[in-house]
């Protein structure tokens, strides 16, 4: 027995009825998929934002804004920490100490006890290296130093911002103050041009009484020299002051 044929207009009607349901189902599925993906993105963004906010809170404990008040607070905090480590400082200078006499004779008194102590820390570190060999590129007491490496080693742990590495970079360092030849103070950096008239390719640290400590050249050892010697006078470029109340820890 054959099935009755379905009129074409009935088939057309059924097709029109089914198509909306099919489109609706497809759209619903797509909408669900889109909503899930959107929620996932939002959750991921929220998680990343929370992680970033946590990171900022941790950073806040040691990030210092660039205003004078916060910098003063940081220096005071650092000084309190330094007080807890007296072993960082050399023995106090006695009235008979030649180094104190040099300061008194030159009438170049430091502006505070803290600045004086910090300066002596640097000088003490420098003098501990006397007799050690010159090593080009050296920055370590167990290996040796070149001229700027010696200063880099002795000064960077007591400064808010690290010094650059080479003598010429230190000579042009913006945080350093230009010092007149008749105003030299213990701890000032001295610069010389040995191989060029325009570039600072050697340096030392002024100790007072016309003396400075230096790591001279290959084959020599770290020593104390006199600035008044003709060789140094002929090659002297100038002095810079990096140890001040504003630059030290």
Swiss-Prot record:
Residues 116-243 form the NlpC/P60 domain. The gene is yafL. Residues 1-17 form the signal peptide. PROSITE patterns: NLPC_P60 (PS51935). GO terms for molecular function: cysteine-type peptidase activity; endopeptidase activity. Pfam families: NLPC_P60. It is found in: Cell membrane. A lipid is attached at residue 18 (S-diacylglycerol cysteine). Its main location: membrane. It comes from Escherichia coli (strain K12). The active site is at 147 (nucleophile), 202 (proton acceptor), 214. This is Probable endopeptidase YafL. It is a lipid-anchor. It comes from the Bacteria. One of its GO terms (biological process) is proteolysis. A lipid is attached at residue 18 (N-palmitoyl cysteine). The keyword Nucleotide-binding does not apply. Keywords: Cell membrane, Hydrolase, Lipoprotein, Membrane, Palmitate, Protease, Signal, Thiol protease.
């Amino acid at each position: 027995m054959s099935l009755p044929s379905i009129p074409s207009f009935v088939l057309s009607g059924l097709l029109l009825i089914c198509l909306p349901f099919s489109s609706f189902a497809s759209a619903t599925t797509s909408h669900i998929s889109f909503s899930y993906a959107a929620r996932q993105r939002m959750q991921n963004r929220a998680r990343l934002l929370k992680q970033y906010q946590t990171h900022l809170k941790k950073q806040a404990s040691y990030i210092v804004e660039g205003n004078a008040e916060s910098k003063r607070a940081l220096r005071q905090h650092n000084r309190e920490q330094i007080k807890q480590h007296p072993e960082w400082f050399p023995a106090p200078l006695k009235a008979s100490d030649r180094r104190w006499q040099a300061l008194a004779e030159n009438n170049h008194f430091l502006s505070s006890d803290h600045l004086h102590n910090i300066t002596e820390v640097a000088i003490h570190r420098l003098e501990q290296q006397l007799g050690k060999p010159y090593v080009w590129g050296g920055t370590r007491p167990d290996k040796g130093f070149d001229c700027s490496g010696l200063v880099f080693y002795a000064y960077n742990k007591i400064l808010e911002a690290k010094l650059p590495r080479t003598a010429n970079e230190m000579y042009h360092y913006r945080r350093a103050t230009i010092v007149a030849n008749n105003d030299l103070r213990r701890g000032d950096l001295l610069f010389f041009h040995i191989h060029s008239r325009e570039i600072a390719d050697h340096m030392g640290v002024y100790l007072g009484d016309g003396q400075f400590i230096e790591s001279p050249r290959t084959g020599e050892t770290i020593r104390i020299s006199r600035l008044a010697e003709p060789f140094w006078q002929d090659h002297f470029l100038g002095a810079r002051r990096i140890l001040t109340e504003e630059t030290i820890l």
